[in-house]
Amino acid sequence: MRLSNVTLLALASFVYAKNVITIHPVDGPLDDPKPLHKRNEPVQNGFYPGVFMVQDDSSGPHVDHVDLSNPGIKMPSGEQPKSGPTYLTTGLVQDPQISIFAGYLRDDTELIKRLNDGDSYTVVLAPSNAAVASLALKPWQFPNAITGKSEKDKDALANENISSFVANHVVVDTQLVTTFDVVKRARTLSGLEIEIFTENNKILVKSNDSTSTVTKIIQTNNGAIWVMDESLVKPELA
C-alpha cells in the first residue's frame, strides 16, 4: 500500500518514544529577548536562569521523553517529506495533559513569539491539568485578589494573574552545557527562585511553595517542555 504525502507527514509529526535520560543543566547569562525585557530579572546573588538540555543516557533518572526535534522516521524512497524544525509552540499542543497551561501561555502573544523563534532557547515548566485543578484558587484568581472589584478591574487583574502564573513557569537562557553533579539553582522569567535536583531516580523542581516531580520531557528544536505534577506557585489563603 502506498501512503500519501499527507499521511507520511502526519506520521513524522506525531512520533512518540520513551527513553531513559540524563538532564544536563545549562548555566549562563540571561538572554535578552526584546519582547520580554520587562519580565526578565537580572542575574544576582549567584542565581542564573538555568536551561537544562536532554541527552540519552541509561544512567539517568526515568521520565517519559518525547523528542519532537528529531522524529527519526525513515520514509520510503521517493516519499521524503520536507524537513523542518519543530518549535515549542507545536510541542505545547502535543500533550493533552498540559492543555490548561498551554491555553494560558498562548494568550501571551509576546512570549509566543519567543516560543516560535528558532534562535531562542526556552524551557517551559508546565504544570499538568491535574496540578492546575488541585490549586485552591484558579491561576487567574491570584496573586491579585479579584473579589469585590468591578468587571473592568477583574478582567485586568485576571490577565495580570495569568501572565504572572505563566512567567513563574518559564526559564530562558543560552545553551552553555555543564555537568549535572550538584543541585542547580535558577530563576524563572518572573524572578522566582527554583532548584533542580535528582532524588530516588526522579527529577525534582523545588520552589518556596512546592516540590514538583518532572513526569515527562518534550524536546523541540528551540527548547523543552517539562511536564510537572505540581504548580511552582500556590495561592496564599487567609
UniProtKB/Swiss-Prot annotation:
InterPro entries: FAS1_dom_sf, FAS1_domain, Mug57-like. Keywords: Signal, Vacuole. GO terms for cellular component: vacuole. It is found in: Vacuole. Residues 85-232 form the FAS1 domain. Residues 1-17 form the signal peptide. It comes from the Eukaryota. SUPFAM superfamilies: FAS1 domain. PANTHER family: FAS1 DOMAIN-CONTAINING PROTEIN YDR262W. This is FAS1 domain-containing protein YALI0D26906g.
